[in-house]
């Protein structure tokens, strides 16, 4: 049993690197199965968001370099380049890292709640792929419980702050009166839903949701009195949009420089504020070169986020202590589980010996032996048989110089200090 958490995030890698290491939802099942097959991993899960791509693995013998090499090969990356941005956590540290991530303690926005849902999705996909077994499954459940405790017992989640909130905060800085602004949201996932909620609460004049499928866009639009359109309608909507915020799972850019340039001409160069939260990016970086365009990537949100963190810093220490306690408790319980099979086999052996001696006793009673004699023989026979194998093994180990076995036997059988010394003294006298 050995746990491994390996990956990159917003603190170790730029958006250029992160978008090259990201997994699309369509890739995950096949990638997980390949990961287990090619790296000798017994269980695995992949968490891939705009801010991080992480692999959670259970192996008999840890081989982080093999896993890192697989990740580089899968995404056609130079191994040394990937290694420069990657981090590796093993066993206790891996457990603690997973719990910190799920609790929002390792997020770009401290305490942001979306990461827990993303972690649950990673677990669900791994179950679908058949790459989660009993050990990683227990770890995920313990991780979810730890994150829930942090949310319930600390103020880490108060004063809602998220990447979505940061994007809207930037929009407020550029457009003093959002009630006169029109917004185009590209995508219909969790982040865009949060953006739509924030914009709606601020009274934005008109919100349009563009998505690959009109059905998904319509479901989201109905919640906030918005309009739903297809991705093909984006060029027309750009002309009317003061704010554009995009977050899809597309592997290719959705908005190019030419389309935005055309929209600006029709807008008579009225400014457009754009935030690209997606990884890989939805908006070509060259769009930012245009006059009258304010383009921000997810990495540009750091300053806004820093301001919003202040209210949560006080709760962070208490949350860290809860996570550490949760990780320690999980590892203790997991190590206890390692003894279950041995204890089960030992109990079965004891019950077999008991049944053998009991059968002998019953035969003696049937043949007329006194109950007292039978009980004495039963007790003696059971004692001798139960002690035979441990006695033989203990003598063998000490004869081989394994004196640590004596201390282990004293602890295992609760014999108390000096038991072995007193018996040795008697034999020497």
UniProtKB/Swiss-Prot annotation:
It catalyses: (S)-4-amino-5-oxopentanoate + tRNA(Glu) + NADP(+) = L-glutamyl-tRNA(Glu) + NADPH + H(+). SUPFAM superfamilies: Glutamyl tRNA-reductase catalytic, N-terminal domain, Glutamyl tRNA-reductase dimerization domain, NAD(P)-binding Rossmann-fold domains. Keywords: NADP, Oxidoreductase, Porphyrin biosynthesis. This is Glutamyl-tRNA reductase. Homodimer. PROSITE patterns: GLUTR. It comes from Pseudomonas fluorescens (strain SBW25). The record marks 97 as: Important for activity. Its EC number is 1.2.1.70. The active site is at residue 50. Pathway: Porphyrin-containing compound metabolism; protoporphyrin-IX biosynthesis; 5-aminolevulinate from L-glutamyl-tRNA(Glu): step 1/2.
């Amino acid at each position: 049993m050995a746990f491994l958490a390996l990956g990159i995030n917003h603190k170790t890698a730029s958006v250029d690197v992160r978008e090259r290491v990201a997994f699309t939802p369509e890739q995950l099942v096949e990638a997980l199965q390949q990961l287990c097959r090619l790296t000798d991993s017994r269980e695995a899960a992949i968490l891939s968001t705009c801010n991080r791509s992480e692999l959670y693995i259970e192996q008999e013998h840890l081989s982080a370099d093999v896993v890192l090499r697989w990740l580089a090969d899968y995404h056609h990356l130079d191994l040394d380049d990937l290694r420069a941005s990657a981090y590796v956590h093993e066993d206790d540290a891996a457990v603690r890292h997973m719990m910190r991530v799920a609790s929002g303690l390792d997020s770009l926005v401290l305490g942001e709640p979306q990461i827990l849902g993303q972690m649950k999705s990673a677990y669900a996909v791994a179950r679908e792929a058949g790459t989660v077994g009993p050990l990683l499954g227990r770890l995920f459940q313990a991780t979810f419980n730890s994150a829930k405790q942090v949310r319930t017992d600390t103020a880490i989640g108060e004063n809602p702050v998220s990447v979505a909130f940061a994007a809207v905060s930037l929009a407020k800085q550029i457009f003093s009166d959002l009630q006169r602004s029109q917004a185009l949201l590209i995508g219909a996932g969790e982040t865009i839903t949060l953006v739509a909620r924030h914009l709606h609460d601020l009274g934005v004049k008109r919100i349009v949701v563009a998505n690959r499928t009109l059905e998904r866009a319509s479901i989201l639009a109905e919640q906030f009195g918005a309009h739903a359109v297809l991705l093909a309608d984006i060029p027309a909507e750009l002309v009317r949009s003061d704010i554009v915020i995009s977050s899809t799972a597309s592997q290719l850019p959705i908005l190019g420089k030419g389309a935005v340039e055309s929209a600006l001409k029709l807008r008579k160069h009225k400014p457009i504020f754009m935030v690209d939260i997606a990884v890989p990016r939805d908006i070509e970086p060259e769009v930012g070169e245009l006059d009258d365009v304010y383009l921000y990537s997810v990495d540009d949100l750091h300053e806004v986020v820093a301001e919003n963190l202040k209210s949560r810093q006080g709760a962070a220490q208490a949350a860290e202590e809860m996570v550490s306690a949760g990780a320690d408790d999980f590892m203790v319980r997991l190590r206890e589980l390692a003894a279950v099979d041995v204890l089960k086999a030992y109990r079965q052996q004891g019950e077999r010996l008991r049944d053998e001696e009991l059968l002998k006793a019953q035969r003696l009673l049937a043949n007329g032996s006194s109950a007292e004699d039978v009980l004495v023989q039963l007790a003696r026979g059971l004692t001798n048989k139960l002690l035979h194998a441990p006695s033989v093994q203990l003598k063998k180990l000490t004869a081989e110089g394994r004196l640590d076995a004596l201390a282990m036997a004293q602890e295992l059988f609760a014999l108390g200090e000096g038991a072995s010394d007193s018996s040795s003294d008697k034999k020497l006298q």
